[in-house]
Amino acid sequence: QSYFHPPVLQYFVNREDLMGELDGCLADGVLHRFGTGEFTDSLIWDAWTDLSSDLVRRFAGQATSILELKTKTARIDHLKGLPHGGRTILSWSLNTERVIRNEERGTAPLERRLRAAAEAVAAGYPVAFHFDPLVIYAGCETDYRRVVDRMFDAVGPESIAWVSLGAFRFMPDLKATVERRFPHSSIVYGEFVPGLDGKMRYFKPLRMQLFQALCAAI
């Protein structure tokens, strides 16, 4: 919410321009990874638009690049029957139940995300998982290990394209925004220091300790 002003979602309707530029990139024969969930949820518009379905079909027709659809939802029924050719990776952002409950309001619970991932695998899709943002709090290592265990209970490692880790970081201006809009949130009150990129990041030894714990669990 510190990147965009005003902090509202925008959906661009010039899809022909998008597809034309995309076809140009796909035609160069170079491996690309395209994603629509960098600053938003890839599937959040799918109740009103068929963009994700259109993209899945588009990528199924080529053999060099991949599409990643990243989400915190569990709404994938509209994607299950599509001809995807294994060129689309459905990925989920995972977190502890405490973080989901307190900081990710309106998103699918962990169990529903993992169930959707299992359904995606059954439909032939490769899947991926993002432990991002990792939030440090008392007992977090134990909680994140449980999430890893539940992830592998839901999906076998042979179906997972990748797992990524990223600790919570934010632009300095976001702290005031969180305090104003989400006064009950404590997410911005950890041991943060300014990073080389200007973002506030957890003190490096704390980050490394949590990364190492998750890597060992994975």
Predicted regions and their residues:
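Alpha-helix N-cap and loop-to-helix initiation/capping positions
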Residues: 10-17, 47-51, 105-112, 139-146, ...
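Auxiliary Fe-S-binding modules of radical SAM enzymes
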Residues: 152-218
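Conserved Radical SAM active-site core
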Residues: 1-91
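Structured alpha-helical segments in the cores of large, soluble enzyme domains
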Residues: 21-28, 78-83, 110-123, 214
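A general structural detector for well-ordered alpha-helical segments in enzyme core domains, enriched
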Residues: 18-21, 51-55, 112-116, 143-151, ...
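Conserved radical SAM core fold
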Residues: 40-44, 74-77, 88-108, 133-138, ...
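Short, electropositive alpha-helical surface patch
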Residues: 49, 91-93, 140-156, 183-189
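Conserved C-terminal portion of the radical SAM core fold
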Residues: 113-173, 217
